[in-house]
């Protein structure tokens, strides 16, 4: 027994010594919202399939040398939401679903690894592909009993002492009270420079003391909840890779010696809530492109940089295979638009075309945007499903499709379901699951992430590696 305890003690000393020798100065904490193991596998298998091979086309982050599996349950539910999951990943504490940075009593605030990094003298950035006040980023700076308290969360962002934020926009920037300034003006009063789009950022960041990078005003006028899906992107749209470049540029300017950043790929989750496979795989690939930007930084500072990417939970219960032993992932290339954006397109076409908005026209449009009748051959039943959905749409009988982040037409929903069916992809839920999520890590101290771990261990391990001060009860 004494020998066992001695061995354990020596192991702890060895690990602590190894971590001290490899303390990272630059920490990249990526979170793929909703990204379970199968989402990653789907993206890599898709890459191989479109090149005509069976297997995977390796992405950058799944090729990192250190890997772990993560439990994601919250304090209140076997299946976590993004708020409780984000709180665990940010603060090392379990809480109830919907809670942002508070304990299960709903009032006791808990600090995050980003706060600990700031206390250690690091420059700190929080970035996302969705709104800056959404659940995952909010968990790193806010303390609210419910994730939908966007106005209050936004005010906590402005009041934080962090250096850089990036995302689509604030969801509720308007004044809460008469005589109060909006959040943009409040942020400017606190020393933030606000840039709309990457070009504005590039012009402004060198002279800025603190910054908030948002997408361009044109996109925010259409949809300020997120930047566009990679599948729907147009030239000039803000990308997660842009956001990562901006994060590095600003934080390195702010403190060349030490920085911490959390960067969320938020729309993997949104695509999975919609059970929309084509944008989902491209969001994972898009997240990889952002990680690759950080990886290039790591290559310049390999002994001083830690990169890890994990997830708050799995979304959609996706399966690669829906009967039999074949996959047809190249079918996903037939879809040129997210089902969410196609709903918008149908509304605009119907309004503009009037009586010329006919089934014959829409059938040709579906061929262009989903490959139906060309790369995807429709069965008679599928053709009828689409035609019936069109009839319901123009007659006002369309019940549509509702998920957490989208309200779609029945026609758009039917189209994406046909694509998934042809790709042999299955979905079990419009919500989250309790599936394991991965951690992939590289760099200084990355070997600390291995085996099966709880989500609360991740921020604590980052803090130990980087030498950030943690609350006593977490040590």
What are these regions (language model features)?
Residues 1-4:
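Positively charged n-region of N-terminal signal peptides that target proteins for export
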Residues 18-22:
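Boundary at the C-terminal end of the N-terminal hydrophobic targeting segment
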Residues 7-17:
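Bacterial N-terminal signal peptides
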Residues 7, 102-105, 474-475:
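Short alpha-helical "patches" and their helix-cap loops
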Residues 25-26, 35-41, 45-87, 134-475:
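A post-motif C-terminal structural segment
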Residues 8, 131, 169:
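Residues that line or immediately flank small-molecule/substrate-binding pockets and catalytic motifs
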Residues 24-42, 89-96, 101-139, 157:
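Mobile, glycine-rich extracellular loop/lid and propeptide segments
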